[in-house]
Amino acid sequence: MASLVLSLRIAPSTPPLGLGGGRFRGRRGAVACRAATFQQLDAVAVREEESKFKAGAAEGCNILPLKRCIFSDHLTPVLAYRCLVREDDREAPSFLFESVEQGSEGTNVGRYSVVGAQPAMEIVAKANHVTVMDHKMKSRREQFAPDPMKIPRSIMEQWNPQIVEGLPDAFCGGWVGFFSYDTVRYVETKKLPFSNAPEDDRNLPDIHLGLYNDIVVFDHVEKKTHVIHWVRVDCHESVDEAYEDGKNQLEALLSRLHSVNVPTLTAGSVKLNVGQFGSALQKSSMSREDYKKAVVQAKEHILAGDIFQVVLSQRFERRTFADPFEVYRALRIVNPSPYMAYLQARGCILVASSPEILTRVEKRTIVNRPLAGTIRRGKSKAEDKVLEQLLLSDEKQCAEHIMLVDLGRNDVGKVSKPGSVKVEKLMNVERYSHVMHISSTVTGELRDDLTCWDALRAALPVGTVSGAPKVRAMELIDQMEGKMRGPYSGGFGGVSFRGDMDIALALRTIVFPTGSRFDTMYSYTDKNARQEWVAHLQAGAGIVADSKPDDEHQECLNKAAGLARAIDLAESTFVDE
């Protein structure tokens, strides 16, 4: 992930989780640190900030940033998130984005981590029913929308954000949330209508977006933290009032990060071999025999010329007393990836370690990165090299990858200027914690009459999770899988106030529904009471003409078991202690 500009170009914090939690800093030190934060702008700097703010408003900017830059050696992104969101507030919309960037030689810690909480506005869509909540204006409206994606786009069209120097090259504020796989039904209304969708057994939103005015960005290279508050001028009677209120809101945000009563994070030791698969997952949305029958049916469609490929998935279920945030902390160790995310949304919590972009738009350049073709990592650099050549000589995997590159070119071409679509990189091998993937990069220049939302609509869902031809493959997925996919194989990420977009593909993503259940268990010990959570781990396999049903089923099991290792680690570290 080269940029979460939006930039989920964020990174796991490098300090140990136990440090920076305030346990080694007395009350006096905390107060001193807090005071230093508020006094870092002298009178001249304050006047300059106010002058730039008012000048921006006079020029027509109606959403303007105020920011402070502080030392980050007393905080980690994980701790900062816990400062902003209480441990027991698991339904409060909020997020933590981090990243480990991949390359041909291995991994590098991404430069930025981004934390956000308390969105000023939310949009929740379920089929065509949309609820818009403006928490700042204390208003709520419900409406029918043929295409709910047009609502955040229309709201953004009213904004003229001020561009100021000193903001990091990362996501600094805007929309954050998820788009389910089923949002394709807003576009393909005739062939994939909601009325013909499979069973919706979880009743999760199809879209959830929060508008985050308060953002904390960790710069792991320069060892500092940017604390940012965006001011909506239209919510105030005057520019002076807007500036004063914005300044107070920013200081309140800083105060929460430097609270005297800094929350503590549960310490833990890594007792498991994180490179191994997790325990076998027994409960699935499809039995082994049903999945194998679906593979056979898919191959019949392929041999008949109906499709070339289809991705068939199944949803596994696991129950755990580990908290979703504890699972996220474990996942950072088990499977560091370009798009690490802990996202509390309406109806569910997403814990993700996605390796793949769904779509990115940065300064009107569209990026699509098909990731298809997989082989395990070697135990040494020499073995990695041997396995890399083995992967690139696998005709089946390479042919499948080229087909998906063509799909990516088609998706980008729908919204790009004529002649601007390019394959920047073709058939590169990227190394991840457990596997290597074949990767390509497709780019294009967004047409002048379109926005990033159009690029997202054209891409969602990508061919690597649906098939080819895409729409026909999705019709067969509806028939064969039997359940709505929800967040799996959709996307999560954000759209900045500047109109840049970075959306990750929701693979290697655990979904924790937050709705109440009648069969939830509780564990009571001397230390605490724990609630049982249901974790959904969904995985799929690309079916082609020579696919073997047993192998494809095992691929699903392996992918889900790799993700389940994070739950194993969270349980052994935080629950079994």
UniProtKB/Swiss-Prot annotation:
InterPro entries to which the protein is assigned, alphabetical: ADC_synthase, Anth_synth_I-like, Anth_synth_I_N, Anth_synth_I_PabB, Chorismate_C
Keywords noted in UniProt: Amino-acid biosynthesis, Aromatic amino acid biosynthesis, Chloroplast, Lyase, Plastid, Transit peptide, Tryptophan biosynthesis
EC number: 4.1.3.27
Transmembrane segments: none
Pathway named in the protein's UniProt entry: Amino-acid biosynthesis; L-tryptophan biosynthesis; L-tryptophan from chorismate: step 1/5
Subunit composition and interactions: Heterotetramer consisting of two non-identical subunits: a beta subunit and a large alpha subunit.
Pfam families named among the record's database cross-references: Anth_synt_I_N, Chorismate_bind
Source species: Oryza sativa subsp. indica
Activity regulation details: Feedback inhibition by tryptophan.
Organelle transit peptide residues: 1-34
Gene field: ASA1
Keyword presence, Transcription: no
GO cellular component terms, semicolon-separated: chloroplast
Protein name as it appears in the record: Anthranilate synthase alpha subunit 1, chloroplastic
Top EC class of this enzyme: lyase
